[in-house]
């Protein structure tokens, strides 16, 4: 799975509000944050005092050298040595404090990232299915990878850099004023020029940074989709089409990234140029003052160093501005995700039904539903299913078969009417308790990276190895499992491509058998395997459905001849219902569907 790249910056829609919410989130890390800020300030103060102390040694050296040349004295190396040792101690303390604040901020930022990833993972389980059906996998993954990583890296760097930059500017300004107010005024003249140039660059680069963020999501989604379906792409020889689509998106990403990085990269040369102008001005004026005896050589050396240190925070603040924007934009996207409306996980306590009462009886009473208010999929659906019955739902694509399953498991709620289990509305059950009553075997089998034993045990996590093996035998999966290298301990890869499609379905059937649910949903479970494998799967299915209410959705009508009830759907409504023989004798829509399949085979 591709790892989305880290973005540089994007402007948040609500910068202040997002930062306020981020600070509230970090409130339980207040102590390490304050401690890190204090150590950052102390480190900066000791670092700022360095040039002023060094100036004493420089002045002593210059004065002693002149005195030696005139024959009136010598260089006081003892005094210079004491000053340099004191200076060394200051810089060692500054480095120690800087190390401590870096260690604290790294730990703090990673803990914040850890908390966000945990909250996002928990949030995913509470989001409705509709959220994921409207978004690409890459977009959801980018919240956990790209956005959280950007947030962590920006948080780690921006806060301490902001504190040290502001402290440096204030401290350096105080030191410069203590040396020469007039030279300080000259040095400050570079500020308006620097700020104006920075604002111009930021203004022009911002739109390209935003385009870069948006285009990266498109590229991530395309790469993820192509990787997941690379077999289909190759089978249809669509490599050129996919490559053209990717190149188009990649070109847009390149253009926006190149322009944003180029404009951002202009800041440093511009600031260096302006800073050098300041050096020249200070050097000229300082030389005049030194010639007049109003300032010492050491103070000139210290002042020039302070001018350099004064322009560095300005450069850093421009970088901090980008990092803060990047952090706010990433945090805003994370908070938008965390603030998404959730499914109501629990039912009203006054009406809450006990899941133990689910005995397999299902009643659809005048159900009406549409994914959007202006488009109704199911118009008026009524049906009663008795415990243990096998119910087949058939109909053309788009008739509403899969939608019925989603309503039954409360992935969506009905717009009108009701669905009841043993007389209790499905909305009276906690969602988790309701879904525990259902077992599913889908055409798109889902197996995770792990052993075969672990994949089957997913149906009931507390099952023993013996129970797992018994479920595999009941699903006709035990034989092929024993022939695999490593048997039940064989490791499946990420997409389970080291077992066949039929074997995947047998494993999912074994998992469902182990779960021992009262109601089963079998959605197109045998439509993508060969006839012999289908017979094995069908045998396992029959064994699975014994004594359980089962809803079978299949286009192969030959597989549901023995169903107790067949519901024929067209345009969201049940147009016919009955057994296979009854529907054939009626000569209606079901008979047309059934006969058309055999006509296709003959042709």
Role assignments for model-derived ranges:
Residues 33-97, 178-182, 293-297:
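Transmembrane helix-loop-helix hairpins at lipid-water interfaces of multipass membrane proteins
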